[in-house]
A protein has these predicted regions:
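Conserved N-terminal phosphate-binding loop of PLP-dependent enzymes in the Aspartate aminotransferase
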Residues: 1-341
């Protein structure tokens, strides 16, 4: 299958077949394909696509993020080209600020293609074994993980809601994580690449009322264009001699799209988060009714508009439970059934 065009929530392939797009650019197209905002970016193309020096959109994007999205994080934002790059820069910043190298991350989390994030991934060939010594893997949604978060660590990075295990009952765990990181003087990084501007205008931090020291964004922020962003407390963001550069970082097209998407979110002209949460819940409820009625060992778990099919009817707390309860060939079975349709 090859996609030829996309409009609103639909994609059309080269044979003229039209489908509902349940991925929406892996979550980046929250206001739909071929929307009016993206057409405005076309005007920016006529004015130039890359200048190397700062463009007229970047300052506004920075101000919108600081004033309307994360007023608690008062430092200047750093912009790059993807969520992966944003997380790489956030880790580098945390290490530079603290003078420590060890970073905690959670099993089942996804922070992009950095070598140190891929230990558990099946496609992890070519990664030096000593890379993993700089990271400590923790168990998500399990209080025992706090014993492994120690003062010799620079930071802990976490998705407020994991894509592999999206759940709405996570506030208490996140607050305990926040408190423990404060106690041990370990920086807390929220990877909001997936949750930012999808769970709410203020992402997972806003929904669960837990504040990180550093935050990263991507996906929705670019409105369909490549983007990443790192923000944090001013004291942290002012750390000197940290390299963040990149040829296409903060390019006019991505920053124009980010400015337009933030203006839409701030004004709530099109995006209604309550409705998104209601639709997400309806999707889960109806599919779970079907799975129960058909006696299928499958369930849909989720938080707001974020949903995940799991191949077990047992309650899971984290990705570790999924690994224990799901059949080893669950994904292959699912792919096979899709091909039969």
């Amino acid at each position: 299958m090859e996609v030829k065009t996309a409009n609103k929530c639909y994609i059309t392939d080269t044979k003229g077949n039209t489908y509902i797009d349940t991925s929406m650019g892996s979550g980046s197209q929250i206001i739909g394909h071929n929307n009016a905002l993206i057409r405005e970016v076309g005007e920016q193309i006529k004015r130039g696509t890359i200048y190397t020096i700062p463009n007229c959109h970047t300052g506004k994007v920075n101000s919108y993020l600081k004033e309307h999205i994360n007023p608690d994080l008062d430092g200047q934002y750093i912009f790059c080209n993807s969520g992966t790059e944003a997380n790489m820069r956030a880790i580098r910043l945390a290490r530079a600020y603290t003078g420590k190298s060890l970073v905690g991350r959670f099993h089942g989390g996804w922070h992009g293609g950095l070598d140190g994030f891929l230990e558990e991934h099946s496609d992890n060939k070519g990664i030096p074994s000593d890379t993993n010594s700089l990271f400590r893997v923790l168990t998500y949604n399990d209080d025992q993980c706090f014993d492994k978060i120690t003062p010799d660590m620079a930071a802990v990075i976490v998705e407020p809601v994991q894509g592999s295990n999206p759940r709405s009952d996570i506030q208490q765990f996140l607050q305990k994580l926040r408190d423990h990181c404060t106690k041990t003087r370990v920086l807390l990084i929220f990877d909001e690449v997936m949750t930012g501007f999808r769970l709410s205008a203020k992402g997972g931090a806003g929904v669960f009322n837990v504040r990180p020291d550093i935050v990263t964004y991507g996906k929705v922020l670019g409105g369909g264009f490549p983007i990443g962003a790192v923000g944090g407390k001013a004291e942290i963001m002012k750390t000197k001699n940290v390299f963040y550069g990149g040829t296409f970082s903060a390019n006019p097209l991505s920053m124009c799209a980010a400015k337009l998407i933030l203006e839409t979110i701030i004004g709530m002209k099109h995006i209604q988060y309550d409705k998104l949460h209601d639709i997400g819940k309806l999707f889960r409820d109806e599919l779970n009714k079907f799975f129960i009625a058909e006696d299928k060992k499958m369930r849909v778990v989720g938080c707001g508009p974020l949903n995940r099919i799991i191949f077990t009817d047992r309650f899971i707390r984290n990705r570790k439970d999924r690994d224990n309860f799901e059949p080893e060939n669950a994904q292959e079975m699912f792919s096979g059934r899709l091909k039969e349709l």
